[in-house]
């Protein structure tokens, strides 16, 4: 029993210290020895009753609950404080990094903005440079146009003086005689009859010239709505002036034109051009200004509702007149509204290679314009290949009057009409060709001519007369050229 002894010894020592402890020893009912240890209360003089004890216990429990609640509240506040301290610690640790990241983002945005500003600055500098170049080009163009204007003024003055001399009778008049047939026609034996040169040279022998020129009155010709338009007989063709050159192979043959009676919104300066190499010719290039035409910058491209044939098209009173592909139909296409206004078959006209000019190219139907109006040049089986002329109504395309010549169409290279007279070109490739025949619709007579005509580029596929400018327009082997003319007094 060492433990019991130690316990009793401790209690005894504690009792001695307190001087109020009592130890009793007695046997219980079963005979077992019991030790009872009593200690006097330091505060209570007597023991409370049972009810008072319970009340005291409850008070103690309440105090304990309150203390426990205070303890839990304190613990909660401590946890909150610990959380706040932890968050503050994290913020302090992450603060410099976040600030640095924000500064880097701001710096990146500023750099991007600077790059955009620099790019805009470069674009502005490039635009300014382009404007300076355009200004220089415009100044150069202005200078060139001024020089051209001065040259035109000089030529106009020279032409006026020439007209004055002609009116005074200082220029010898052309005489039509049998000797007007070119000397080259008497040298046919020098050529191989199978060569192209011989075929072209034959054109100079096809027509028998009249023995003399008959002086016709103006009343014998189709009348112009403007009265006397300054008509006369062709006596001289100048050197070709090259305006521009086609860019692609489709421009080896072609037709270009200006409207001698322009209708709004077009002007005398508006130019149209068609490249005619190909099987589906529909594009018509339109140039509002002469400078655009010279530089090759069209202001509009028309796409025709049906393809055209060859180089016989013309523009007159705001409409494009052309031959429909592989047909004898002439079509009037109004350029401003881009609509077909009229179609008309030319009775009996050959087409698609039946009666072309000597160079070929399906030039069976050739439209022309002069001071008196719209014409069509063609041939028929009944005419046995001779050139037939018909005056057309420009609105309805009805044939108003027809003339049949005795000039074989396939023996000449091209034809045009001035003041009601048909003129033909002897060769499309010879550098020194001639205007070799003239047919007068006023008298129904024809005669031979020897007016020199230059094929500078040796392949003239189109020759037309512009009555407003009094010039020939031609397409010579990719090149668009003009010729000045001189007409005698009627």
Swiss-Prot record:
Location of the Olfactomedin-like domain: 230-489
GO biological processes: bone development; clustering of voltage-gated sodium channels; ERBB2-ERBB3 signaling pathway; myelination in peripheral nervous system; negative regulation of cell-matrix adhesion; negative regulation of Rho protein signal transduction; negative regulation of stress fiber assembly; neuron projection development
Post-translational modification comment from the UniProt entry: Palmitoylated.
Record's subcellular location: Secreted; Golgi apparatus; Cytoplasmic vesicle; Secreted, Extracellular space
UniProt: Ca(2+) binding residues: 366, 414-415, 463-464
Tissue specificity statement from the Swiss-Prot or TrEMBL entry: Expressed in optic nerve head, ciliary body and retina.
UniProt KW keywords: Calcium, Cell projection, Cilium, Coiled coil, Cytoplasmic vesicle, Disulfide bond, Endoplasmic reticulum, Extracellular matrix, Glycoprotein, Golgi apparatus, Lipoprotein, Membrane, Metal-binding, Mitochondrion, Mitochondrion inner membrane, Mitochondrion outer membrane, Palmitate, Secreted, Signal
Keyword Transmembrane attributed: no
Function summary: Secreted glycoprotein regulating the activation of different signaling pathways in adjacent cells to control different processes including cell adhesion, cell-matrix adhesion, cytoskeleton organization and cell migration. Promotes substrate adhesion, spreading and formation of focal contacts. Negatively regulates cell-matrix adhesion and stress fiber assembly through Rho protein signal transduction. Modulates the organization of actin cytoskeleton by stimulating the formation of stress fibers through interactions with components of Wnt signaling pathways.
Residues listed as glycosylation sites in the UniProt record: 43
Disulfide bonds: 231-419
Signal sequence bounds: 1-18
Coiled-coil portions: 52-169
Chain intervals for the UniProt region annotation (Disordered): 146-188
Protein name: Myocilin
Subunit relationships: Homodimer (via N-terminus). Can also form higher oligomers. Interacts with OLFM3, FN1, NRCAM, GLDN and NFASC. Interacts (via N-terminus) with MYL2. Interacts with SFRP1, FRZB, FZD7, FZD10, FZD1 and WIF1; regulates Wnt signaling. Interacts with SNTA1; regulates muscle hypertrophy. Interacts with ERBB2 and ERBB3; activates ERBB2-ERBB3 signaling pathway. Interacts with SNCG; affects its secretion and its aggregation.
InterPro entries xrefs: Olfac-like_dom, Olfactomedin-like_domain
Gene responsible for this protein: MYOC
Motif (Microbody targeting signal): 488-490
Bias (Basic and acidic residues) ranges: 146-157
Gene Ontology annotations for the cellular component aspect, listed alphabetically: cilium; collagen-containing extracellular matrix; cytoplasmic vesicle; endoplasmic reticulum; extracellular exosome; extracellular space; Golgi apparatus; mitochondrial inner membrane
SMART domains assigned: OLF
Pfam family, one: OLF
Entry's Gene Ontology molecular function annotations: metal ion binding
UniProt key word Cell inner membrane: no
Organism listed in the record: Felis catus (Cat)
